[in-house]
């Protein structure tokens, strides 16, 4: 049913549009083939001819079994040519009644004319138009497939929508999850989408690149195929002329022009699109024969009866196979011949160039000899050269011109040699010039950690200490010839290093540490000593040019910009030469972490080594702590001793004071006293003045005056202050005679206690001395 539907569709299309081209028919066939996938297992298992017949079968709508049955004799033709001819004649009658005949009857005039043209093509030939049609068909199918693939590749699809959800089942599953699980799943899908999108973009770019390469290859192959077709046509025409040349003209005309017309309704096993190539071949062969054969119709008719159709088909088949093999052989031979010719040409050119070079060298040698410039003899190779097509006069003029050119080139080369001749080196002869190459210890401290330290200090000079002569140090001028590492780590300024310099003094070389380099300049005696040693040892002195070079190196080292790698290297080197870590606690913590990690990994040896390092670090830290706290302990001991001594001295002073006072209370003017404020009035002061102005009554007999009594009372008071016994306290005299005032009329007012206006605490120095009895 499928085959009938296809045939009916083709017939309807052909009947509706008679002017439709063959390309539209092919596009319709391709669309039908895409809509209905037809199994092609039989076509895949068949040979190359079967695949071509299947394509023709799909186009004609005939069953593939009949095609296979019709093409079977053509496959057996390689074994026996006679059987192939008989079978082909026997199969012509069934082929005429095939469905292709009925289809051809309904085709437009353009398609119906094709079987008539097919009759002119002989069996066994493959036309160019057939291959072109098949290629166009494959290219159209390829373009369709590429367009479909490009359309599929133009959009990225991972099976989820914009909300990162799939079908309804996936939505229900996500809705059934908790919010946290849903967000986690969506986040995973986002990451997966990014990965897949990146991979898809990379694959798309690769596909586009492959398509571009394929298109370039196709365009190149098309050009090559067109070129090969052109060459084949030319070779066929040439071979046809060569093949027809030895034969009689009548025979050649009969073989080429005696073509029996075949019925138009016959469908050949080859493609019906091969007629244009046959027409082109026939035209070329007829044109080639037209120049050879005479225009005689009777002779051509007589020769045509001599050849049979079978003989002619066999000969044509042999010619086709011979053309194929000859093309390959001729191409291979042409390539091999071209390679050999190119190689021979290159060898010949190389030989010519070497010969010319030898001739020029010989001429220069002859010209350099005095008196031989006019007597230059030419070699036989120069006169009888194979590549010289000029006359004898040219050959005679050529050496003269060459001699003149060689002379001029020699003169120019001599002038250039004089200009390029190296100037005589100027050596250092003064101490000032040598001091420009000197490096001090301060600069060594700055350069020792630089990556360019060795290249900077090489060929420089230093003032090195070699020992003492009595109590005076001895220095020598030495040249730096190398940088080495010594076995001792020493301090150089603020850094520690183990580098040393290999120094040269005359012919002697020794290694010195950087700490022995002097900062002072060379003295005159040291310079003279070094100069004398160099002359005796035949050592070349440094040149003036070396000064500029080394000064540039030193300047570059002073302005060197450190990189991250340089800083890491310097830090590592300083840590290697440091006696102890900068932070014991951090170092111990790092070692403990490494030890725990090694224990978890099972590396017990490494853990044991790390434990030993931790113990050593703790021991070193404890030693440093003792050394640091030793001075602190001495100071604290001295402070404690002084404190105890002060306490003892204070106690002794207290005891002595107590022993001196003997329990007496001594008023100290500098101690605080309890005081009470009192109000003072002027009236009381006037009363005191009046009492002082009043005359005192005479003392009773046996009594002293008040002044005397005051002195005596003061003395008693002083003695009483010293003696506090009851007897002394009650041992005092009472004066019963009271003196009366002079003015009897005045009634004395009640005496009020005089107010002390001055505080007891306010004592001047004189009162204090009086109170102490110092005055």
Swiss-Prot record:
Keyword DNA-binding: no
Region (Disordered): 1-370, 385-427, 673-720, 738-775
Major localization listed first in the record, in broad terms: nucleus
Occurrences of domain Plus3 (ranges): 428-559
Compartments reported by the entry: Nucleus, Nucleoplasm; Chromosome
GO terms for cellular component: Cdc73/Paf1 complex; chromatin; euchromatin; nucleus
Bias kind Polar residues: ranges: 247-256, 266-288, 709-718
GO biological process: Notch signaling pathway; positive regulation of DNA-templated transcription; positive regulation of transcription by RNA polymerase II
Start-end of Acidic residues biased regions: 120-129, 154-168
Gene Ontology MF terms in the entry: DNA binding; RNA polymerase II C-terminal domain phosphoserine binding
Coiled coil: 604-665
Modified residues (Phosphoserine): 49, 51, 53, 269, 271, 385, 388, 390-391, 412-413, 415
Alphabetical UniProt keywords: Activator, Chromosome, Coiled coil, Notch signaling pathway, Nucleus, Phosphoprotein, Transcription, Transcription regulation
Biased composition (Basic and acidic residues): 169-224, 306-330, 338-360
Phosphotyrosine: modified positions: 384
Cited PROSITE patterns: PLUS3 (PS51360)
Function, as annotated: Plays a role in transcription-coupled histone modification. Required for methylation of 'Lys-4' of histone H3. Plays a role in regulation of transcription. Required for maximal induction of heat-shock genes. Plays a role in Notch signaling in the wing margins.
Subunit structure: Interacts with the RNA polymerase II complex. May interact with the PAF1 complex.
UniProt protein name: RNA polymerase-associated protein Rtf1
Gene from which the chain derives: Rtf1
């Amino acid at each position: 049913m499928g085959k009938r539907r296809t045939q009916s569709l083709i017939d309807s299309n052909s009947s509706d549009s008679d002017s439709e081209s063959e390309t539209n028919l092919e596009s319709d066939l391709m669309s039908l083939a895409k809509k209905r996938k037809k199994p092609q297992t039989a076509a895949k298992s068949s040979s190359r001819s079967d695949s071509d017949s299947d394509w023709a079968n799909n186009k004609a709508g005939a069953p593939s079994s009949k095609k296979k049955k019709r093409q079977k004799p053509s496959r057996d033709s390689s074994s026996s040519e006679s059987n192939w001819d008989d079978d082909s004649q026997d199969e012509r009658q069934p082929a005429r009644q095939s469905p292709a005949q009925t289809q051809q009857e309904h085709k437009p005039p353009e398609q119906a004319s094709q079987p008539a043209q097919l009759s002119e093509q002989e069996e066994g030939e493959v036309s160019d138009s057939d291959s072109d049609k098949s290629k166009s068909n494959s290219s159209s199918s390829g373009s369709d497939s590429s367009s479909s693939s490009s359309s599929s590749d133009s959009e990225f699809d991972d099976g989820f929508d914009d909300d990162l959800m799939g079908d309804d089942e996936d939505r229900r599953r996500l809705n059934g999850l908790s919010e946290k699980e849903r967000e986690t799943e969506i986040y995973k899908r986002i990451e997966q989408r990014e990965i897949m999108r990146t991979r898809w973009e990379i694959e798309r770019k690769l596909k586009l690149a492959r398509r571009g390469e394929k298109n370039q290859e196709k365009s190149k192959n098309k050009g090559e195929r067109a070129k090969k077709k052109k060459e084949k046509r030319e070779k066929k025409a040439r071979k046809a002329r060569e093949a027809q040349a030895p034969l009689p003209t009548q025979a050649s005309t009969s073989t080429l022009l005696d073509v029996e017309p075949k019925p138009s309704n016959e469908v050949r096993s080859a493609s019906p699109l091969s007629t244009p190539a046959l027409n082109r071949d026939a035209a070329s062969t007829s044109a080639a024969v037209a120049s050879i054969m005479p225009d005689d119709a009777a002779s051509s008719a007589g020769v045509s009866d001599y050849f049979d159709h079978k003989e002619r088909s066999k000969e044509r088949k042999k010619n086709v196979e011979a053309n194929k093999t000859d093309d390959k052989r001729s191409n291979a031979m042409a390539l091999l011949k071209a390679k050999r010719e190119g190689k021979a040409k290159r060898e010949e050119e190389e030989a010519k160039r070497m010969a010319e070079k030898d001739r020029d060298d010989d001429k220069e040698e002859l010209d350099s000899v005095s008196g031989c410039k006019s007597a230059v003899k030419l070699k036989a190779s120069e006169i009888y050269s194979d590549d010289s097509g000029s006359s004898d006069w040219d050959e005679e003029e050529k050496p003269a011109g060459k001699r003149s050119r060689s002379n001029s080139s020699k003169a120019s080369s001599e002038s250039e040699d004089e200009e390029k001749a190296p100037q005589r080196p100027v050596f250092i002869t003064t101490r000032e010039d040598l001091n420009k190459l000197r490096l001090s210890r301060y600069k060594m401290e700055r350069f020792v950690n630089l990556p360019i330290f060795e290249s900077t200090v090489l060929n420089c000079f230093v003032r090195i200490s070699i020992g003492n002569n009595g109590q005076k140090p001895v220095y020598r001028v030495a040249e730096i010839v190398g940088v080495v590492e010594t076995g001792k780590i020493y301090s150089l300024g603020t850094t520690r290093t183990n580098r040393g310099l290999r120094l040269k003094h005359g012919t002697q070389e020794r290694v010195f540490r950087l700490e022995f380099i002097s900062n002072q300049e060379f003295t005159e005696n040291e310079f003279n000593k070094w100069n004398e040693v160099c002359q005796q040892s035949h050592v070349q002195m440094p040149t003036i040019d070396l000064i500029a070079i080394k000064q540039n190196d030193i300047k570059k080292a002073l302005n060197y910009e450190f990189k991250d790698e340089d800083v890491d290297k310097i830090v590592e080197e300083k840590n290697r030469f440091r006696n102890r870590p900068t932070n014991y606690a951090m170092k111990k913590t790092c070692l403990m972490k490494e030890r725990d990690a090694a224990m978890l990994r099972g590396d017990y040896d490494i853990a044991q080594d790390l434990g030993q390092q931790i113990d050593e670090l703790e021991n070193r830290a404890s030693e440093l702590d003792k050394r640091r706290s030793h001075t602190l302990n001495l100071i604290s001991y001295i402070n404690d001793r002084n404190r105890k001594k002060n306490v003892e001295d204070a106690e002794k002073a207290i005891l002595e004071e107590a022993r001196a006072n003997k329990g007496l209370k001594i008023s100290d003017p500098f101690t605080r006293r309890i005081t009470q404020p009192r109000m003072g009035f002027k009236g009381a002061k006037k009363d005191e003045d009046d009492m002082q102005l009043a005359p005192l009554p005479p003392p009773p007999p046996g009594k002293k005056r008040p002044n005397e009594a005051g002195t005596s009372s003061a003395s008693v008071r002083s003695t009483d202050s010293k003696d506090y016994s009851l007897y002394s306290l009650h041992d005092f005299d009472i004066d019963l005679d009271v003196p009366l005032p002079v003015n009897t009329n005045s009634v004395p007012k009640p005496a009020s206690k005089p107010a002390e206006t001055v505080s007891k605490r306010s004592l001047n120095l004189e009162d204090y001395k009086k109170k102490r009895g110092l005055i």
